[in-house]
């Protein structure tokens, strides 16, 4: 007779056996420990699962029963109750299957194991979906679950082999990948744990760029504006005729962005893990995302949600670029839904009785033509009238425009610039300038929760942005003359702070403010009609 795992106060009841093992789930991009309690007793035979379960979890009983049978373990005619706690948290998905199977085996005392092994099991997390043949299948959200488990005293994780790479970067946890339930049973039969996964070195960020700035002829003011935007993580709108180079300059941006910090890389990898977008051999994500959206995107795909409350594109772009080409052609409700994540840097997804808050710290890069046909101001090709152009530009509402710090008008490249032998600024040189400005911001905001000038809260503007009397007068005149909003005023200040950082200046100068106002282009979009 094997070891009994129920509480000693019930030791007189030979028909009551109890076990407890641990699994986990994701809440947003955070993990949560789940206790899997199993009670086996005399009574009407059956396998009952309780604990606020989605249908995918309720179906686990049949999957586990078949997987155990096909691995050589037949369940006796007993009443088996499995409780997943805490009971007030909804459990969804098939990631609890392995833990449920282990709990049943322990509760039935199917194998005789030592006290030492049982204690080790209590410090082990079990994850994985089971196929009917006993195959252990991969799951989503491994990284945040393992991270949470490590912080709660777990020292070993049994998980699908495909999920081992992403989990291996969590310190002080032994990762034991398995591909079949038979490997899990060998723990009880032989007292031997599966072989540990050997973590590979974290790959360095790739130096490969989509487009090098040096390949773009002319457009020096546009390049400067893009450098400022990236340095301070400011939203940017590129406006110009078709073929002027808007999409090309947007594709330069990933190559000039600063590298991800460890914390940013961890957060981004958790996001992609929860979304199920990490490759089986993938470790940490080391490059900033560049998410280019299709014009037929739905609001759910953009913000997140759906049946599994998956992260949307605004979350997948965290730390990187969210690119919307032909911005006015997107559905109006999609454009307007960007208001809240652009302002708050988070997005809340609600489903049933649960809501999840995901990060949405992206840099919006948008592009549009001057008019519906795309040829304005070339009147030989463009036949749009002023009313049509104005209507087209106003598809982007004032509240959205107010959240865009830099609005660049891009003119077609002249013939002389196109064939000039003079080489423009390269992406490498641009990145060096951005890194210098980034280092100044890191030094300035070292103890803050925000990292970039564009993220300075309104309540801390005076602390980090100081203006002389002359500058305040200029801003007051502009504020009153252009009917600038309060939001726009503070965004100009943040932009001026970034321009000063690019120039290596501690104090904001008159030229910095004037340049910020130029790039803000408050009278846009109809000032040239």
Report the location of each language-model feature:
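Basic, amphipathic alpha-helical bundle interface domains used for macromolecular binding and assembly
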Residues: 56-61, 76, 83-93, 309, ...
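Hydrophobic residues in beta-strands of the RecA-like P-loop NTPase core, especially within AAA+ ATPase
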Residues: 127, 178, 324-330
């Amino acid at each position: 007779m094997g070891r009994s795992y129920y509480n000693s106060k019930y030791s007189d009841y030979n028909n009551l056996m109890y076990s407890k093992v641990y699994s986990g789930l994701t809440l947003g991009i955070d993990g949560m420990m789940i206790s899997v309690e199993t009670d086996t007793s005399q009574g009407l035979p059956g396998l009952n699962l309780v604990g606020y379960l989605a249908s995918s979890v309720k179906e686990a009983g049949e999957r586990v029963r078949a997987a155990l049978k096909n691995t050589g373990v037949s369940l006796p005619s007993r009443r088996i109750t499995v409780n997943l706690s805490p009971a007030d948290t909804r459990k969804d998905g098939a990631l609890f299957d392995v833990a449920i199977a282990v709990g049943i085996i322990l509760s039935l005392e199917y194998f005789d194991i030592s006290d030492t092994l049982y204690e080790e099991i209590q410090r082990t997390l079990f994850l994985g979906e089971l196929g009917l043949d006993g195959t252990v299948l991969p799951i989503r959200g491994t990284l945040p679950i393992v991270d949470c488990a490590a912080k709660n005293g777990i020292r070993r994780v049994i998980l699908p082999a495909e999920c081992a790479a992403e989990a291996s970067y969590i310190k002080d946890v032994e990762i034991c990948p398995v591909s079949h339930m038979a490997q899990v049973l060998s723990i009880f039969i032989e007292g031997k744990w599966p072989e540990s996964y050997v973590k590979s070195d974290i790959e360095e960020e790739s130096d490969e760029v989509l487009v090098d700035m040096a390949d773009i002829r002319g457009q020096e003011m546009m390049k400067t504006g893009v450098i400022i935007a990236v340095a301070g993580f400011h939203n940017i709108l590129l406006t110009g005729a078709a073929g002027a180079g808007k999409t090309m300059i947007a594709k330069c941006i990933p190559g000039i962005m600063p590298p991800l910090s460890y914390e940013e890389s961890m957060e981004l990898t958790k996001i992609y893990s929860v979304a199920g977008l990490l490759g089986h051999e993938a470790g940490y994500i080391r490059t900033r995302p560049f998410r280019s959206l299709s014009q037929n995107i739905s609001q759910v795909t953009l913000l997140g949600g759906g049946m599994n409350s998956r992260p949307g594109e605004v979350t997948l772009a965290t730390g990187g670029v969210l690119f919307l080409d032909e911005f006015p052609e997107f559905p109006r409700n999609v454009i307007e839904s960007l208001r809240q994540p652009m302002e708050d840097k988070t997005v809340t997804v609600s489903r049933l009785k649960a809501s999840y808050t995901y990060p949405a710290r992206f840099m919006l890069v948008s592009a549009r033509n001057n008019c519906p046909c795309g040829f304005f101001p070339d009147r030989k090709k463009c036949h749009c009238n002023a009313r049509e152009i104005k209507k087209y530009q106003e598809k982007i509402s004032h509240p959205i425009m107010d959240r865009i710090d830099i609005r660049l008008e891009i003119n077609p490249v002249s013939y002389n610039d196109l064939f000039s032998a003079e080489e423009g600024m390269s992406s490498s040189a641009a990145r060096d300038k951005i890194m210098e400005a980034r280092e100044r911001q890191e030094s300035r905001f070292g103890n803050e929760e925000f990292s970039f000038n564009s993220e300075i809260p309104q309540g801390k503007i005076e602390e980090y942005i100081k203006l002389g009397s002359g500058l305040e007068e200029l801003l007051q005149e502009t504020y009153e003359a252009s009917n600038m909003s309060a939001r726009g005023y503070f965004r100009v200040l943040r932009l001026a702070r970034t321009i000063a950082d690019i120039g290596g200046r501690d104090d904001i100068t008159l030229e910095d403010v004037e340049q910020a106002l130029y790039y803000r282009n408050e009278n846009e979009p109809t000032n040239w009609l």
